[in-house]
């Protein structure tokens, strides 16, 4: 399951753990630790968190403990730093220092600007702060997490060594241009939402906007996942899409994570099935933007 993370020098697992769930109050400290340890035992070495994920950074840092050196930690920020205005150079600098404390580490492997719009992404002070942090050894890779126009710009920006974006059966927008562009520059690419919010769970259009959008696309595409189950089709399509380094699954259930690991362990989809998925999207979704 191990692959290279672009030209960054990092090695990552094809399957990553999205740690947003372990930051929620409903999840106990013990459950968070068991999930992280189960991920490690499954061979997962890529862990993705963010400043906005509740207590996730603190819990991940505690759970990793002495095994920190065997994993790649990806976090996200640009906001919420003590005593700083959001999306300023000072916020980036202070935010990285605070993340290091929460994660109990002396460096973050990948630090993303978290979904800021294009006009914010252009601010030179943000790039200067990232470069200083990298030169100081506090981060190894400066990155951007987001979609659409901002992603396209970031994929061409010299500051960034990786990007994170939405990629799944129902959201292939980034595969048209931004991901190939990033891959051509040997950037790492993290795919978020590889299950596309799993709209196949519903017999009727769901009420939540993000799931409803995926459900609408699923219906429009009229794609039959056979001979596979939807979950396996979705995970293998995303994890092995050209240019993708790691597909991040967000869950708090060990059995779901283990099932995802088994699916990705099956390797890439057959080429004819991949072509069918791409064709079903392009036939109706040529104008669909990335789902934010």
Task: Show the residue positions of the predicted features.
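Short, acidic/polar
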Residues: 26-39, 87-103, 146-154, 230-235
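Active-site mouth loops of central-metabolism enzymes
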Residues: 18-30, 77-93, 224-225
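N-terminal binding-site loop/beta-alpha segment at the start of enzyme catalytic domains
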Residues: 1-71
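Beta/alpha (TIM)-barrel catalytic core signal, keyed to glycine-rich beta->alpha loops juxtaposed to Asp/Glu
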Residues: 115-292
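Active-site groove signature of glycoside hydrolases
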Residues: 100-119
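Alpha-helix-loop-beta-strand connector modules within alpha/beta enzyme cores
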Residues: 58-77, 128-137
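Acidic-and-aromatic substrate-binding clefts and catalytic sites of carbohydrate-active enzymes
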Residues: 24-28, 50-58, 80-85, 118-122, ...
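Conserved, mostly hydrophobic/aromatic
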Residues: 5, 17, 47, 60, ...
């Amino acid at each position: 399951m191990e692959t290279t993370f672009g030209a960054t020098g990092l090695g990552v697992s094809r399957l990553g753990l999205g740690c947003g769930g372990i930051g929620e109050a409903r999840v106990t400290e013990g459950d968070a630790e068991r999930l992280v340890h189960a991920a490690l035992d499954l061979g997962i070495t890529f862990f993705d968190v963010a400043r906005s994920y509740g207590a996730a950074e603190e819990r991940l840092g505690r759970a990793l403990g002495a095994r920190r050196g065997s994993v790649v930690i990806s976090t996200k920020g640009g906001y919420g730093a003590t005593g700083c205005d959001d999306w300023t150079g000072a916020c980036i600098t202070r935010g990285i220092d605070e993340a290091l404390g929460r994660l109990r580490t002396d460096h973050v492997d990948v630090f993303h600007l978290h979904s800021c719009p294009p006009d914010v992404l252009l601010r030179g002070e943000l790039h200067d702060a990232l470069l200083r942090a990298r030169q100081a050894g506090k981060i190894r890779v400066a990155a951007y997490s987001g979609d659409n126009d901002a992603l396209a710009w970031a994929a061409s920006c010299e500051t960034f060594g990786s990007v994170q974006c939405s990629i799944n059966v129902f959201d292939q927008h980034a595969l048209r241009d931004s991901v190939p562009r990033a891959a051509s520059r040997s950037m790492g690419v993290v795919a978020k939402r590889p299950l596309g919010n799993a709209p196949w769970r519903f017999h009727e259009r769901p009420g939540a906007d993000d799931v409803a959008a995926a459900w609408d696309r699923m219906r429009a595409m009229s794609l039959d996942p056979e001979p596979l189950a939807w979950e396996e089709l979705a995970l293998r399509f995303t994890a092995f899409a050209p240019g993708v380094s790691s597909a991040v699954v967000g869950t708090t259930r060990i059995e779901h994570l283990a099932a995802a690991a088994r699916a990705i362990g099956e390797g890439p989809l057959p080429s004819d099935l991949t072509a069918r998925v791409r064709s079903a999207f392009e036939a109706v979704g040529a104008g669909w933007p990335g789902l934010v």
